[in-house]
Amino acid sequence: MTLDGIDKALLIWGPMPDEALSYIRSVGWLVIVPEGRPFMTGLKQNAQKLKKAGIKFVYVNDNTLGILFNKGKIFRTIIFYKEKNDTGIIGFCGTMYVTILSRLHNVKIELFAAQALQLAGSVDLLGGKKYILKDNVRDFIVEASDEAVSFKELQ
């Protein structure tokens, strides 16, 4: 699919619970499924669920989100968070990135509790092949971690 083929889209971020499928279906827009590195939650969890449910989606790499926002393709963002507290949420790696892009482009953010991250086997493998750098260079990689996002930042 090309950018011209995307009219109005819903971005989902974080591991989507099954209960969210009916809501996403009711919105009726194309769903943008980012890869969700480093755990590939978009490809390994969300895309599979959407496909099984018959919901139309496109899979994109995380870096493409800036272009989609800039071109006015994303009209709503759903963030599936790990934890909610008095000051905000704890989201998966990249939650702040998606929050900033959504706010910058005046896109409404909705919050839903996430499904537990399902890591079947090594997260270094995709289709049985390594996609993360060799172990001997891990000292040069900034490890992903959960991100705290305040309610102020989410508005």
Question: Where are the predicted features?
Answer:
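N-terminal active-site beta-alpha-beta segment that forms phosphate/nucleotide-binding
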Residues: 1-56
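Conserved phosphate- and dinucleotide-binding cores of soluble alpha/beta proteins
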Residues: 41-155
